[in-house]
Amino acid sequence: LAAQDYGLTARTRWLEAPAGRARQQNAGARSAAGEAVWFLHADSRLPARSVAAALDFAGDEGLGYFRLRYLADGPMPARLNALGAGLRSRLLHLPFGDQGFLLRRVTFEALGRFDETLSGGEDHALVWLARARSVPLVDLSMPIFSSARRYRDEGWLRTTLRHAWLTVSQARRFSAMARQRSP
């Protein structure tokens, strides 16, 4: 997030954390001072209206997420993947981390933060746990733009098939984990 684009530079600072996305996101959450935590990927871009929606939602109950769109830095079919992410989010209630998770700190802590024992899919695991604990998943109905360069660099079909396989295999694993960790 280019915080200066939104007048947020006074509240933005750089920090270093050990390798691993879960560790890094948890370190960011620990260092944050607000009542809400907002997790964005480094290549995320948000229009001003999306930032406004996030600021309006911050502090509300639930796990908020945005509608994924891809930048024009990848192949045209990547737009189909963005449509698929929207369907997955709305129909299966499975938004992923590239959709910019926003939730109250107390909710994040109650969910146990991102699971640092996982080698990947920590965002997926958090969503399954939120669902198991009846935390509402809230579509903020605003776009978030991410790079499609992986589809360009690694091939659209190969990347799409790998993501589909990961989604299914992680869903089986994380849904069972979430049931075990829920009251």
Segments and roles (model prediction):
Residues 16-32:
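Glycine-rich, basic loop-to-helix element that forms the pyrophosphate-binding segment
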Residues 37:
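Short aromatic/hydrophobic "clamp" motif used to bind/position activated sugar donors
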Residues 33-34, 98-111:
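Conserved nucleotide-sugar donor-binding
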Residues 128-183:
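Hydrophobic helical membrane-anchoring modules
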Residues 48-77:
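Conserved donor NDP-sugar-binding/catalytic core segment of glycosyltransferases
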Residues 120-126:
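Acidic donor-binding loop at a coil-to-helix junction in glycosyltransferase catalytic cores
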Residues 41-45, 49:
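The conserved acidic donor/metal-binding loop of glycosyltransferases
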